[in-house]
Amino acid sequence: LICTFSDVYDGVGMTNFWCLYNLVVYASMLLIKVMGNEGNYIDALMVHKENILSLLRAKYIFFCGLILVPTLLLMPTVIMGKWTLWMILSYALFTIGFQYFVIFQMAVYNKTSIPLNTKFTSKNGVENNYLQIVISLSVFIVPITFVEILQSFLSEMVAYGIMAVIGMSFVITNKLWIRNIYTRLMARRYENMEGFRSSR
C-alpha cells in the first residue's frame, strides 16, 4: 500500500527492491529451510526410491503457485500507474526460475531437523547455518544489483525481458536441476540423515 499510494519509494532502485522483495520473501523464509521439517521422518522417506525427488518437485510446484499471492497483491501498483505489469511478471518469472534454483540448493546442505510444531517464521536451525544466511542475503542483493547494471546500459523493457528469459530458462529446465539436486542429496544422504537424527 505504501508503494501504491506514496511517492516515497518511487526511485528506480527502491522500485526494484520492493518488487523483488515482495516476490521472494515467502521463499526466503520458508523454502530456505527445505528438508528441515522432513528431517523428522527422513527414514520413512528414504524407504521408497525417488520419494525425495517427488517431494522436491511437489515443493517447487507449490511455491510456484504461491507466487500468485504477492503477484496479485502488487496489482494495485499497476492500476495506479506506479509499476508496469511487465516488470512484475518478469520479476515473478525470475523468482520462480533462478531464485528458486538457488534456494533449492539448500536441500543438499540442510541437515537440521525443525520440530513440526515450530512457527514458520521461527529462526530455528538458521542461527548456526551460515550457508542459509548467505543464500538468504544473496537472493535479495544479487538480483537487485544485476537489474541495476542491466538498466544502466539498456532500456527498462529490455532489462525486464532479460530477467524474464533467465527465469523462464530455469522454469523450463526445472526437472533437470531438481534431479541434479536430488542426486547430490542422495550422495550425502548418510551425513544428512545423521544430522537430522541428532537434531530431533
Residue ranges and their predicted role:
Residues 46-51:
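Short helix-to-coil transition segments within interhelical loops
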